[in-house]
From Swiss-Prot:
Gene3D superfamilies: alpha/beta hydrolase. Belongs to the LovG family. It comes from Homo sapiens. Changing S119A: Abolishes the hydrolase activity against long chain alkyl ester substrates. Residues 44-68 are annotated as: Disordered. This is Esterase OVCA2. It catalyses: a carboxylic ester + H2O = an alcohol + a carboxylate + H(+).
Amino acid sequence: MAAQRPLRVLCLAGFRQSERGFREKTGALRKALRGRAELVCLSGPHPVPDPPGPEGARSDFGSCPPEEQPRGWWFSEQEADVFSALEEPAVCRGLEESLGMVAQALNRLGPFDGLLGFSQGAALAALVCALGQAGDPRFPLPRFILLVSGFCPRGIGFKESILQRPLSLPSLHVFGDTDKVIPSQESVQLASQFPGAITLTHSGGHFIPAAAPQRQAYLKFLDQFAE
């Protein structure tokens, strides 16, 4: 009997996460899904500076390898490289470049069976699927999506109306009861856009859980798509 092919999943990092840091943060999940899913991590295209130190000092990007630079998918102010998920933004600066980057990754690194997004990456993953469902040829619909600490992106212009339509693909939504960065009601609102959404809550905060209870839920969800 032929071995089961691992599912391939493109994973979109959160705001202020480096590619290497996101790989490390998903290490427990990668171990939990070993042999069942291959996780390919992608961080945003835009470098995010560290907050100023006590004397206004910032870290030196020039001494930091690209894969270790904190990055983001878009900023919510025109002049400052900052992002707030919970406030109506003045702009979504850099979003189009990020959509282009995801499209390139899907084309260059794919095919993928599913998408996984964490925090800002979850909001972007949902938007990518909404655009694909609306007919954007850059974004073929995946077979499934996993959204961890997700939220509905605000202030994205005409794209916001696209996200208000039901998204017809299997989805698993994971969020913590004590998440102070993305409150659970934000993730619940995003899940409501997916008919038949499965929700998985945990007692922790803003991270990707991979303990035994979550591992079983992930495997049960992913086994629907095994070949």
